[in-house]
Amino acid sequence: MQDSLKDILLTFSFISRLPVKLGELSDWEVRMKRIPAYFTIVGYIPGLIYFTGSFLSLNFGIIAPLLSIVLGFYLFDLFHFDGLLDTLDGFLNQSSKSRRLEIMSKGNVGPFAVFYGVLYVIVFWELITSIEPVAFVFGSVFGRYTMDVVLVFSKPAKNEGLGAMLFPFNRFLLVPATLFTLPLLLIDVKLFLVSIFSSWLVGFLISKVSEKQIGGVTGDVLGGSCLIGQIVVLLILNYLI
């Protein structure tokens, strides 16, 4: 139990900005390969932050959703947003695989990243002020689940970096990652099934596109897949609830 708790804390330290104190971990690299099992746990916190902002927007206007986006992105989603922007700049560049990887590793914001990044924020804002608040819990959890799906179908594009540390990926980790999504099944069966299907579809497509564009996945691609999965789930649920 204590060992699993350390893995969960490591997961939070890896994919969020929460100030987590881990102490000395002699088996850090081994634990890193286990953290995908807990990605979906992390998703509940930003989901509840966005849920609160969306719910309070009925009484507090734009202030509540604005603050929730600022907090949610600062603590959780900016890390993935950076990966999304780098991925867009790399994938949409008409060049070789090695050149795309170079563009992504430099992290310079190009025109593709600016345009689609702004578009993402606009769509997210429109949703948080109009959609049923509970959709954000589904979106955030299954956005993280999408990263697990990407790992199932992928290989590392390079032998270094954050993404490479998660390989070789143990597919058994998908079992606990899926189990941690089951509380959402109690909220709404239909929304759960639609969300998990969307995550699998988006994750599979991203893995195949990434393999074609750069020969595998990187940490940027994994981070970007989280937000792509999240926004796809939100857009679909927008028409269901």
Curated annotation (Swiss-Prot):
The chain crosses the membrane at residues 34-54, 55-75, 109-129, 133-153, 165-185, 186-206, 221-241. It is an enzyme of class 2 (transferase). Its cofactor is Mg(2+). Keywords: Cell inner membrane, Cell membrane, Cobalamin biosynthesis, Magnesium, Membrane, Transferase, Transmembrane, Transmembrane helix. Its EC number is 2.7.8.26. GO terms for molecular function: adenosylcobinamide-GDP ribazoletransferase activity; cobalamin 5'-phosphate synthase activity. InterPro entries: CobS. Pathway: Cofactor biosynthesis; adenosylcobalamin biosynthesis; adenosylcobalamin from cob(II)yrinate a,c-diamide: step 7/7. It is a multi-pass membrane protein. It is found in: Cell inner membrane. GO terms for cellular component: plasma membrane. It holds the Pfam family CobS. One of its GO terms (biological process) is cobalamin biosynthetic process. It catalyses: alpha-ribazole + adenosylcob(III)inamide-GDP = adenosylcob(III)alamin + GMP + H(+); alpha-ribazole 5'-phosphate + adenosylcob(III)inamide-GDP = adenosylcob(III)alamin 5'-phosphate + GMP + H(+). Joins adenosylcobinamide-GDP and alpha-ribazole to generate adenosylcobalamin (Ado-cobalamin). Also synthesizes adenosylcobalamin 5'-phosphate from adenosylcobinamide-GDP and alpha-ribazole 5'-phosphate. Belongs to the CobS family. This is Adenosylcobinamide-GDP ribazoletransferase. It comes from Fervidobacterium nodosum (strain ATCC 35602 / DSM 5306 / Rt17-B1).
